[in-house]
């Protein structure tokens, strides 16, 4: 170690004040350090769980405190590629070959007719439930206000939803009042620069105005007068002044391409779509077999219970998202097979005889460790009783065994192997 005098110790200690002790999971921000430096030239570091032997080091300093000196990359995890890969594996379809102008797929953003139901009282007029970017009640409302029929309109809507003060109190009002069309409103950063250049303004000035607006700084000095002289309408100038943050168009295009491919599977390969979606939800604790596999009436009752509960928790709201998709799954004529000790996978939703077979982790409270233990314990075995299953799977608790029994996973297996002679 290094020796330091009291003054240096006090200086270093001051720099550590306010640092978090617990690390938890980081979403994947990577701080890039120049080759001739080390991270501790800029800030202290931590080892996860205070384990000095760990290869991973993290820092919990607010990034803006060092953004003038260091580059940070946000390498965030994404669910959509996982879902697409699963659907590719189940169907043999390469997602990159999916046409982005498929009419049936495009239609679900305005109508659910192609899915076999219309104007549902729970899901509304569109078929966009479970489609990334467009699956919340807020974005489905946005679809109804704009009725998109082209891919580029979906890109604009993605910009609306990811921006701050871009849709509500801004573009939405302009569209509903017919002051502007969807295509003429500001959705992404690039829209401003391209539009101003088309009005005859200088490219560099158009870029500077776009940069100021997208960061929420309003219009630069003199810009409003220049825009008026170029023939930019008052409503457009007013819209620029309201914006606090604008999404980049390339980012929106990437998101919408992914969403459209997933929507294509929903229309043309529904069972693989739902199997992949439910898997994704179950990985986050958002799928509960007890609430979701008991038929459409049971699902409607659970949706109503959460909707009518003013004190619904964040977990309830998360379950509601899945319940809506399960409701649609039933509405389209599909159903679940009962969880089976012999056939269910530990974590994946399987397609069996035209039905979806939930995994063991779909049972609330049964974790992956116990689920894999069940898969391992059943290999090459035919059980005579539930007691034998418990003996073969030591990581599965009595509580879990009861949950499996309640879910019908054991079929007609008796509790014990003992035979009564009388």
State what each model feature region is.
Residues 1-422:
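Noncatalytic, beta-rich nucleic-acid-contacting surfaces in large DNA/RNA-processing enzymes
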